[in-house]
Structures are given as structure tokens and as C-alpha cells.
């Protein structure tokens, strides 16, 4: 049966104009709330305000508007159940065939460094998840849309299927909804849990969308997948698909390089630094120091820098076989040179996003569950070193500076190992 009635209530209005106009062209009655209703009316579309539809006003500054039998009854009652249909008619409940809802931006709000608890709480959506879940539960009859990326697909399908969507599409959209609401609730749980040290000990929630299938795991016969917002931190500009070990190497490289303020180059293999060099001005000089530490390490390894990749260094690297190159930015000449390395994975690192991400604990699987550990974000400074002098002759300032540099490198080495580095 063709979609006849739709309820639209969104925070993100991306693509909404085209979608709403498309629904209107199919003769779909539009019901909406607050700012979304005003937006649709501004487009010249006929819209029924939710308060007119339910017969009840929006209350408590919009906190209560869609939690009503006219809404949830219209979503939940089964069209193939005679008793449901009878009760709906007796209570004046009309079927709502499509729900388009995206949620208050809670995750974006709490990601702000200066967010207050009150601001965070106001971005906890109640009506939105409730409508999404009601519609998703009854996906046999209701099309539920939680992502603007699905708007065009739905309109295309309505065009093909006489104003309706297929059961398979509705099922897929319902699964997407439950993933979204699960992610949303986990974000709220973790944020509020972090406000209380006691509550974080009781449980820990992990839920993230699939980012991409990885090329393989530790070995080619092992499947691997990457979840979460990795791409917001590390943007792959070119090269082969990432593998499981590539992702670990990229994380290790970021941990290493963000400890240094001066121009620095790191070379890593299997997450361990093999050479690190630093210079006051020129990345090429820093590279030369790192390279001379172990001239074999760059081949098939990971190279990371904490300054924009320059043409000079890119020219050197373009002649070497490397698996991954990471930089906060690449100038045009450097990109042109590195593009010739078609298989090399060129990564742009969003340093600010990485520094936020590394506040989260390290998570590792364990039999029957997983473990968490606070990430080692402490940086050993000169004051720390001077306080621990136990030799008869105290180190010189130059020696202390060298120790600090080497300490920051050696903390990235796993297990028992010796490491040489030059500043």
C-alpha cells in the first residue's frame, strides 16, 4: 500500500527540502514538529503541526510533543491485525506510514571541550528515539528513516513501487535505526558515567558503526573490520586498503609523533619506533637523523611527521618503498610526488581530533569480555628527570634534553628492547 502519511522531525536538515518535496509530490500528508514544521512551511509545503494533529500543545519548552497515542498508536498498530485496526479506528488513530527522524546532536555537543552538564542533558533526545523504535518495531508496515543518506533511495523506490517501499528495504532501515539508537544511548551512558568515577566501574558500553572492512587481519586468511570514527582522525588519501596491522601502526605512529613540538620524523615497524629524528627547522634533516638510526627500517615500514609534508622530503620518500606515510598535511608538490607511489597508503592526520580521541581508554579483548586501560599520556619533562638524579655527577642540561627526547621515544617500544635515537 502506498505511503499516505509521514511524520518528519529532524535536527539535521541536510537534504530535507528535496525529500519533503518528493513526498508531497507522491501525495503524502506531512506532519511535523517545531522548527522542522517551520522549515517545511517556509518551502511552501502544506504541513500539519503535531499539536494540531494530537490535539495537545507542545509542553515544557518542546520536551513533550510526540509522546502521544495518536503518534505511537499510528506507528505501532499492525495493519494486518483486525483487532489492532478496529482499536485504531475506535480511538481516532490514523496510520503513520513513514517516520523521518534524526536525533538531537548529543555526541557533537559533548565533544565540545567547554560543554556543561546542563547543555549535554538538554541534547538528550526522548521523543526522537521513541518514534524511531516504534516505527522500526513495526517495519512490516512502516518506513523509518534516520539518515539523510537514505532519502534519495526511498524516493527512487517509491517511484518504482507505486508510492511504497519494499519489505526488504524497510527491514534494512529498521536495523539501521536500532544501531543508531544503541549508539546514541551508549554515548549518553558513557558521558554521564564519566561524570561519576563510581558509575564507570559498574559497566562500560561499546557500540560503533562499521567504518570499513579491512584488507585482512594479522594474516591474509584472517578477516578484520574497523568500527567507529577512524576516518575523522586519519583520512586515507590514496593507496591500498588498510589492514589490521596498518591501523595498529598508524595508532602507534600518532602516539609517538604527537609528543614532540619541534619538527620530527619517526620510522616504525610493527608499532615500534626504529628511528626518530628531530631538527629545529628542516624535516629533511630530521629524516636524515631518523634514517641513519636504521637504514633498513623505512623499507615496508611507516613514516610519520609532525609538520606538513614538504616537496623536499616527499622527493626523498618517493624513492623508497614504504607501506604508510602519515602527516598532518601535504603541500601540492608533495602530493604530486607521492601520488606516484600508488600502493603506499598516504594518510592525513587530524591532530586535534587525535588528541581528543586519545583521552579514551585503550580497549583490548579478553576471554569472555574485554579490558580497559588508561592511555599513557604522561610526558616526561626536565623537572621529572632532575628530581630522579642518583649519580654523583648530575647530568648537564644538554644530557637532560637528550634524556627527555629518548624517554619519549623509548616509551613507545613494546616489551624489552634497546632503541637508539638522535635529536
Which residue ranges define each predicted feature?
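ATP-dependent carboxylate/acyl-activation modules
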Residues: 1-8, 98-101, 184-188, 192-423
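N-terminal glycine-/serine-/threonine-rich phosphate-binding loop
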Residues: 1-53
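Short hydrophobic/aromatic-enriched beta-strand-loop microsegments
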Residues: 27-31, 44-57, 99, 143-144, ...
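Glycine-rich nucleotide/cofactor/substrate-binding loop typically near the N-terminus or early
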Residues: 35-106
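Active-site/ligand-binding-proximal alpha/beta "capping" segment
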Residues: 79-129, 133-136, 389-397
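Mobile "lid/hinge" segments at catalytic clefts and subdomain interfaces of large enzymes
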Residues: 131, 138-154
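Non-catalytic interaction/clamp surfaces of large macromolecular machines
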Residues: 149, 153-204, 214
